[in-house]
Amino acid sequence: MKKIVLTLINFYRKYISPSKPPTCRFTPTCSAYTFEAVQRFGVFKGLLLGTWRILRCNPFNKGGYDPVPEEFKLLRRNTK
């Protein structure tokens, strides 16, 4: 299952994404983030993290650098 999901993400990144203007507000891009999250945490947790990232990728969020967390946490708390 993991290999299928990663193949689908790669298909999107190679064939669909280049035909669209860049809109991702984050680094790494949402597709790269989801790919890494699935690799690191498996299909279920990786897709949860990827979906949460895509939901945050909108004009109301400033975006910026947002790497895949070292540990699985769906919600992060600011430590400031």
UniProtKB/Swiss-Prot annotation:
One GO cellular component, as annotated: plasma membrane
Q: Where in the cell is it found?
A: Cell inner membrane
Main subcellular localisation: membrane
- Source organism's superkingdom? Bacteria
| Keywords tagged on the record | Cell inner membrane, Cell membrane, Membrane
Look up the signal peptide feature and give its range: none
* Membrane topology, from the record: Peripheral membrane protein
Q: What does this protein do?
A: Could be involved in insertion of integral membrane proteins into the membrane.
What HAMAP family does this protein map onto?
UPF0161_YidD
Belongs to which family?
Belongs to the UPF0161 family.
Q: What is this protein called?
A: Putative membrane protein insertion efficiency factor
Q: What is the organism field in this record?
A: Kosmotoga olearia (strain ATCC BAA-1733 / DSM 21960 / TBF 19.5.1)
